[in-house]
From Swiss-Prot:
PANTHER family with a match to the protein in the record: CYTOPLASMIC POLYADENYLATION ELEMENT BINDING PROTEIN CPEB, CYTOPLASMIC POLYADENYLATION ELEMENT-BINDING PROTEIN 1
Residues reported to bind Zn(2+) 1: 515, 518, 537, 540
Keyword Zinc found: yes
Protein name per its UniProtKB record: Cytoplasmic polyadenylation element-binding protein 1
Species this protein is from: Homo sapiens (Human)
Source species taxonomy: Eukaryota, Metazoa, Chordata, Craniata, Vertebrata
Modified residues (Phosphothreonine): 172
Pfam families noted in UniProt: CEBP1_N, CEBP_ZZ, RRM_7
Region annotation (Necessary for stress granule assembly and correct localization in dcp1 bodies) ranges: 330-566
Ranges of biased composition (kind: Low complexity): 177-195
Residue ranges of every copy of the RRM domain listed in the record: 311-408, 430-511
Domain-level remarks: The 2 RRM domains and the C-terminal region mediate interaction with CPE-containing RNA. The interdomain linker (411-429) acts as a hinge to fix the relative orientation of the 2 RRMs. The ZZ domain (509-566) coordinates 2 Zn ions and is probably implicated in mediating interactions with other proteins in addition to increasing the affinity of the RRMs for the CPEs. A continuous hydrophobic interface is formed between the 2 RRMs.
Alphabetic keyword roster: Activator, Cell projection, Cytoplasm, Membrane, Metal-binding, mRNA processing, Nucleus, Phosphoprotein, Repeat, Repressor, Ribonucleoprotein, RNA-binding, Synapse, Translation regulation, Zinc
Compartments reported by the entry: Cytoplasm; Nucleus; Cytoplasm, P-body; Cytoplasmic granule
Cystine residue pairs: none
């Protein structure tokens, strides 16, 4: 970001207005420089070095940083009659402390080493280029003002923890702390000749930049330099928010929580199992995403003649203190049964949930289908439902609740599949996966809803477990590519009926496929974004989605449990 001349002048003004900050100036080090020059037989040129401190009183009488010729001359260590200047405040040469003349190798190029840059350009040109472009390229050559000595600069290093920035600082401590009697004995010495006394003088120099340059945040007004750095950091974090929404996820993706993630991506290997985690999170995306379209209406009526039920039924609204023994004692009159508590994904699904947190529902699994028929005959039900779906209720008791009415939801096996056109060939490439289905939604109703929204539905199926009871997902096949892509693009659909309101999730139906990139490895990961829309192996996924515009893509994986259950 390039700053205008007015902004740069304002920045320099703010810097020099802070009298208490240790400034990079010879004004407070004039005596030291005179002694250094005397030791070096007056070989240094201090013709343009400022020696007079700038106080607030003088500065207030200097509009637009203009000084008279006499004032400028009075600030020189060795004033000359030929000296001319139009500015009272120090320029880039003044900020260099006259260290250009000391032949400090690498002073004007703190990002380089002595060995790599033997033939350097003039320090004046380098410092001027940094000051004219104070942000420059933060990833490349940092400005001179961002290279403080410890401890004043320690907080800034914490704000920029990237290794390349940390390593790019000019390490002056070996030079300033050296006490070798012969500079040639030290590999870090930047002087061609010197002594202990000269090293002591150099060590006492105040070369830390003003504090306004060190502070990147605060309650006061931000100067142009702070605004520039802040905007750069905002842009980088905005890019991170597209991948990882929270600081926790960002720290997992880029170890060390680097401000610039690209460096860590190149240096640290990506977690090989991050794709699986993202795919699992995507399966619950309907809970946190807004619906793109809504369907509302009445579900198709159901007319059953001698229906066949699944041996598994759902009990809703069970007493909070109910036990497995209480359930078995209540329902064993209809036949042998077992109890499945919520949390089927756990290691012990047949055990009640831990703690005193009631789930409110449970599954009963009978050994025989006729036991379900007997249970439904013992229930009270409402056959006058507008959609033809009878609601069954059974009264049961627990130790603390008497005559609690619980809802019994059976499943008719014929509701698992619906075919609109039996002669139509089903194309898996035009099939979508629908997740987060409501338990009262059968295949015919699902086909009707998606046909109203996108058209072209020829088949709908509800995924079931080993007991042929629905597991909350289904598949819908279209007869044309346009309807299929419309459904995939919709992603989230809200269904509103007189009985329930539910938001479902639509994804491409996944098959076993080879990687579409290398064609040699299995491709278990699918990218649903229209830019990709391909199957990937693990290596090809990382390679493809390391590009800047593709990092936000979410992977899909086929659910192994769904494959085994249906």
């Amino acid at each position: 970001m390039a700053l205008s001349l007015e902004e740069e002048a304002g920045r320099i003004k703010d810097c020099w207005d802070n009298q208490e900050a240790p400034a990079l100036s010879t004004c407070s080090n004039a005596n030291i420089f005179r002694r250094i020059n005397a030791i070096l037989d007056n070989s240094l040129d201090f013709s343009r070095v400022c020696t007079t401190p700038i106080n607030r009183g003088i500065h207030d009488h200097l509009p637009d940083f203009q000084d008279s010729e006499e004032t400028v001359t009075s600030r020189m260590l060795f004033p000359t009659s030929a000296q001319e200047s139009s500015r009272g405040l120090p320029d880039a040469n003044d900020l260099c402390l006259g260290l250009q003349s000391l032949s400090l190798t690498g002073w004007d190029r703190p990002w380089s080493t002595q060995d790599s840059d033997s033939s350097a350009q003039s320090s004046t040109h380098s410092v001027l280029s940094m000051l004219h472009n104070p942000l420059g390229n933060v990833l490349g050559k940092p400005p001179l003002s961002f290279l403080p000595l410890d401890p004043l600069g320690s907080d800034l290093v914490d704000k920029f923890p990237a290794p390349s920035v940390r390593g790019s600082r000019l390490d002056t401590r070996p030079i300033l702390d050296s006490r070798s009697s012969s500079p040639s004995d030290s590999d870090t010495s930047g002087f061609s000749s010197g002594s202990d006394h000269l090293s002591d003088l150099i060590s006492s120099l105040r070369i830390s930049p003003p504090l306004p340059f060190l502070s990147l945040s605060g309650g006061g007004p931000r100067d142009p330099l702070k605004m520039g750095v802040g905007s750069r950091m905002d842009q980088e974090q905005a890019a991170l928010a597209a991948v990882t929404p929270s600081p926790t996820s960002a720290s997992k993706r880029w170890p060390g929580a680097s401000v610039w993630p690209s460096w860590d991506l190149l240096e640290a290997p990506k977690d090989p199992f991050s794709i699986e985690r993202e795919a699992r999170l995507h399966r619950q995306a309907a809970a946190v995403n807004e619906a793109t379209c809504t369907w509302s209406g009445q579900l198709p009526p159901r007319n059953y003649k001698n229906p066949i039920y699944s041996c598994k039924v759902f009990l809703g609204g069970v007493p909070w203190d109910i036990t497995e023994a209480g359930l078995v004692n209540t329902f064993r009159v209809f036949g042998s049964l077992s109890v499945e508590w919520p949390g089927k994904d756990g290691k012990h699904p047949r055990c009640p949930p831990k703690g005193n947190m009631p789930k409110g529902y449970v599954y009963l699994v009978f050994e025989l289908e006729k036991s379900v028929r007997s249970l439904l005959q013992a229930c009270s039900h409402d056959p006058l439902s507008p959609d033809g779906l009878s609601e069954y209720y059974f009264k049961m008791s627990s130790r603390r609740m008497r005559c609690k009415e619980v809802q019994v939801i059976p499943w008719v096996l014929a509701d698992s599949n619906f075919v609109r056109s039996p002669s139509q060939r089903l194309d898996p490439s035009r099939t979508v996966f629908v997740g987060a289905l409501h338990g009262m939604l059968n295949a015919e109703a699902l086909a009707a809803i998606l046909n109203d929204l996108f058209g072209g539905v020829v088949y709908a199926g509800i995924d079931t477990d080993k007991h042929k009871y629905p597991i909350g997902s289904g598949r819908v096949t279209f007869n044309n590519q346009r309807s299929y892509l419309k459904a995939v693009s919709a992603a989230f659909v809200e269904i509103k009926t007189t009985k329930f309101t539910k938001k479902v999730q639509i994804d491409p139906y996944l098959e076993d496929s080879l990687c579409h990139i290398c064609s040699s490895q299995p491709g278990p990961f699918f990218c649903r974004d229209q830019v990709c829309f391909k199957y990937f192996c693990r290596s090809c996924w990382h390679w493809r989605h390391s590009m800047e515009g593709l990092r936000h893509h979410s992977p899909l994986m086929r659910n192994q449990k769904n494959r085994d259950s249906s």
